[in-house]
Amino acid sequence: MNNYRKDLSSIVSLVNQGSRVLDVGCGDGELLEYLKKDKEVIGQGLEIRQDRVNKCVAKGLSVIQGDAAKDLSLYPNKSFDCVILSQTIQATGKPKEVLSELIRIGRETIVSLPNFGFWEVRLNLFLTGKMPITKRLNENWYETQNIHLCTIADFVNLCDELKINIKKTITFNSKKIKTFKEKPRAIENVIAEEAVFLLTS
Amino acid sequence: MRTDQNKILCSYYNDPNPLVLESGQKINEHQIAYETYGKLDKNKSNTILICHALSGDQFVASKHPITGKGGWWNRMVGPEKPINTDRYFVVCANVLGGCMGSTGPSSINPENGKTFSLDFPVITIADIVNAQLRLIEHLGIDRILAVIGGSMGGMQVLEWAASYPKKLVSAIPVATSSRHTAQNIAFHELGRQAIMADPDWKGGNYSETGVSPTKGLSIARMTAHVTYLSEASLTKKFGRKLQDKKDLGFGFDADFQIESYLRHQGLTFVDRFDANSYLYITRAMDYFDLEITHKKNLTEIFKGTRNRFLVVSFTGDWLYPTSENLMIVRALSAAGADVSFVDIDSDKGHDAFLLEEPQFDKTLDGFLSSVYSSLG
């Protein structure tokens, strides 16, 4: 199982059966399909790219073509049981504003992100003196969509600043998956490649 | 059965029951002219109702009896097309108030044997939909798989979903609005004033003289036609090109291709459209405001709906812009409805929904197929 699949299955494990879910940046609708099948959710997606929206619509998913940076205002407060932002927060222009919007819209929010504090990333930067290129972060700095990369510690700090409650954290690398009640241990900022957070206001 | 009434060969339904209008007035009996394509399946579950726009009619995918041209949505409706007539039973009816066989101001008033003209009651989008519902029931259809329409057709779609959600599985409003804006009303008023300023209009009673206000109607059409295009599409198609000449004529003939094109649009329109129908139908659109008709806000109107929605807008449409369509999406989302939305990238203006837009075809095909297969 590759890390991407681990990321999806961790998210699925945090979603309650039959809940109303919004997947922000839903892509081809892979996660929504997975959630519909496994958790019988009532799912909705938000996706900016036309071809991806079409794929979702053809699969019978309900998806709105829009931009997470401005179209989240479409949704009233607490209009979803769960709002998911999977591997996208680091690619948004204003992560802080987006996170606040997600918390406003969802009773619960799930955010997954690549950990820039992972030891391989650190080592890569230390040894080469250049922006790290790893399996997970595989594009040059001038090409990558990831304009706001952060570490697990950075994200936890942002949640503290916004008074967002971390209910659960799942961290993983190619070898292990770990689940923490509330925040992860400090060492995870070094040994985890990715993290999934379950948040509430 | 298709019959030939007033040289319009299509199917007709004579509704013997009075139709009470939104205004409180009543039409005692009326006729609806319609076309169908494909076959109704055993469970009567494969119907797609297409609602036409202001200048459209029931000939969505068949040869027009007056112009001889192909159907206005030929590219979308037919075997192997997104609205696949091998799979779906397609119904398209001329709207109440229209002039292609359905009862309207050019029809004969059975009470006095004269043409209705302005004695025809003012109708609304809700009245048009109520007449369609009667037709659908007459055809023995309990539930429509999808109701789809662009522009004024989209208003009918919204009205169907607001008034008769249990009669539908899905609704596809395209390039439309939940209420006519001041700009929309303004352009319609230009058209109406052009018709009424034509001396041949005769206070609406031109049927007595046998000369219809073609000048006024063609100007109305020319004005409206510009609103269906975009600066980009006009520039691409015409630019400042001259019509059949090398130099400016220093006069007021059609020097530019765009002028000649518009004049042609106006002239051909009057052959197939009735001036009074144009007044009545534009009025119905102007009066359209779902919140006023239903005395609730948009979100409340759709609260609890089980219908699936696909809302479609086009980036280059300035008449029914993306923002207007997004208002519908916003309300449906807030109401907890199952809604998809696409904003098709196009520079063709409002008419884009009638033109070649492959992404629109793909979206529609995907949505309809998934709704169809969800019925098992």
Model-predicted regions and their roles:
Chain A
Residues 73-82:
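A short acidic, Gly/Pro-enriched loop at the edge of an enzyme's catalytic core
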Residues 97-101, 108-201:
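S-adenosyl-L-methionine-dependent methyltransferase catalytic module, highlighting the catalytic core
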Residues 2-18:
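Conserved alpha-helix/loop element of class I SAM-dependent methyltransferases that forms part
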Residues 17, 78-79, 105:
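Alpha-helix C-terminal capping/helix-to-coil transition sites in glycosyltransferase folds
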Residues 25-27:
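Class I SAM-dependent methyltransferase "Motif I" SAM/SAH-binding loop
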Residues 82-94:
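A short SAM/SAH-binding and catalytic strip from SAM-dependent methyltransferases
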Residues 30, 34-71:
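Class I SAM-dependent methyltransferase SAM/SAH-binding core
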